[in-house]
Structure formats: structure tokens, C-alpha cells
From Swiss-Prot:
It comes from the Bacteria. Plays a role in the regulation of phosphate uptake. Gene3D superfamilies: Phosphate transport system protein phou homolog 2, domain 2. Homodimer. This is Phosphate-specific transport system accessory protein PhoU homolog 1. Keywords: Cytoplasm, Phosphate transport, Transport. The keyword Cytoplasm applies. PANTHER family: PHOSPHATE-SPECIFIC TRANSPORT SYSTEM ACCESSORY PROTEIN PHOU (PTHR42930:SF3). Belongs to the PhoU family. SUPFAM superfamilies: PhoU-like.
Length: 232
């Protein structure tokens, strides 16, 4: 039988660890983007160094989650909640890895002495992707299902941004206005940001599940029928 008082206390602590990890990942992504915008090698290296802390926190969350499962033998609904927390943590860890990828582009450009010209479209994608991750953090902390749902719907916008950047880069290559090395960097950065968007989208689905107990298919049916409170 589950000791509900201690069980809920440990779940609260677990969620607090995830909140801390979400803050670190959001900060890392912000630093990675800023390092590239300003070609700040020191900031780029800070992102790479902070990844170890994010990875360690992810491992701690996994270990605590498995200990909770072993100690309390939770019922199916509680087990699904814990597994969702684990998925949330793993998505954060992947965003941390992608932030490192972006920071590494700064170091590569600097080492190869390639002049980086910031595309307006890439800057826009930087801003949109960072805002989605930061707002996912807000939705998680404030248990805001409506915000999570609005962010979830925004994923298509980020996908279109990535496609637009790819088209612009291809056109510049055809016109001879960009080197092959810089073109590849643009495309890889846009791809990394699109993947960050995918993981942020997962975070939103996980917030919705944690707060409503419904997967996205069930939640969307509720939105369509008017039984869910999220804005359409």
C-alpha cells in the first residue's frame, strides 16, 4: 500500500529537480544562441562545460524516479506520472545536447576564421525557439495547461522557419553569395533549432499529461468537444 504523504512529498521533490534542470537547460540554450550572435568563445565553452551538470542532474532524476517506483509500488496512474517526468527530463537533456551543438558552431567558425553573418531569419528562429523553451518552463512551473497547448501548436511555425532558412541558403549558394562551409553551418544550426523545437513540443505534451492525465489524442478530442479549457 502506498504511503501517500511520503509518496507525494518525494514526487514534489522530483518535480523540483526537473524544474531546476529546466532552468539550467533554458540558460544553456540562451548562452549558446548568444555565443553565436556575438561570437563569444568564452560563452560557448561555458555551454559545453554546463552540459556535464545537466547530464548529472538527469541521471539523479532517473535514479530518484526508479527508487520511488521500487519503494512505493505505485498504481498505474501514478506510475504513468513518474514515467512522464522521466520523459520530460530526457527531453531536457537532449535540448542541452543540442545547445552544445550550437555552441560548437561558434568555436568552429572562430577556429576556421569564417566570418559569420547573422541571417534575419535565423535570428528570428533563435528568438522563437528560445521563447518556446522558456515558456515551456513557465507552463511546467505554473501547471499551465492552456500555455502548454498554445506552445504545442506553435511547433509548425518553427518547422516552417527551418525550411525557409534552408531555401534561403540554397538560393545564396546558387548565386555564389555564400561559402560552402558557412552554408553548412546555417543549415546545421537551423536543424538543431528545429530539433530543440521538437523536444520543446514534447515538453508541452508532457505538461498536459501531468496536469490532465490525458495524452495528446485524448486531450485534442476534449478540445474539439469543448470539454477542455485550452484555447483553440
Amino acid at each position: 500500500m502506498v504511503d501517500h504523504v511520503h509518496f507525494e512529498r518525494e514526487l514534489t521533490l522530483l518535480k523540483s529537480d526537473v524544474s531546476k534542470m529546466l532552468f539550467l537547460v533554458s540558460e544553456s540554450l540562451n548562452d549558446a544562441i548568444e555565443s553565436l550572435e556575438t561570437m563569444n568563445e568564452t560563452l560557448a565553452r561555458k555551454v559545453l562545460e554546463s552540459d556535464d551538470m545537466i547530464d548529472e542532474l538527469n541521471r539523479e532524476i532517473e535514479e530518484k524516479a526508479y527508487q520511488i517506483i521500487a519503494r512505493y509500488n505505485p498504481i498505474l496512474k501514478q506510475l504513468r506520472y513518474i514515467i512522464t517526468i522521466l520523459k520530460f527530463s530526457n527531453d531536457l537533456e537532449r535540448i542541452g545536447d543540442l545547445s552544445c551543438n550550437i555552441a560548437e558552431k561558434c568555436l568552429f567558425l572562430s577556429e576556421e576564421k569564417i566570418k559569420f553573418e547573422m541571417l534575419k531569419e535565423l535570428k528570428d528562429m533563435f528568438g522563437s525557439t528560445l521563447k518556446v523553451v522558456q515558456d515551456a518552463f513557465k507552463a511546467f512551473v505554473e501547471e499551465d495547461v492552456d500555455l502548454a497547448f498554445r506552445l504545442w501548436k506553435f511547433d509548425d511555425v518553427i518547422d516552417e522557419m527551418e525550411k525557409k532558412i534552408r531555401r534561403i541558403v540554397v538560393e545564396r549558394i546558387r548565386e555564389g553569395n555564400i561559402s560552402a562551409e558557412l552554408a553548412l553551418v546555417y543549415i546545421l544550426i537551423a536543424r538543431d533549432l528545429e530539433r530543440v523545437g521538437d523536444h520543446a513540443n514534447n515538453l508541452c505534451e508532457e505538461v498536459i499529461y501531468i496536469e490532465t492525465g490525458k495524452n495528446m489524442k485524448e486531450f485534442l478530442r476534449g478540445v474539439e468537444s469543448g470539454s477542455e479549457g485550452a484555447d483553440s
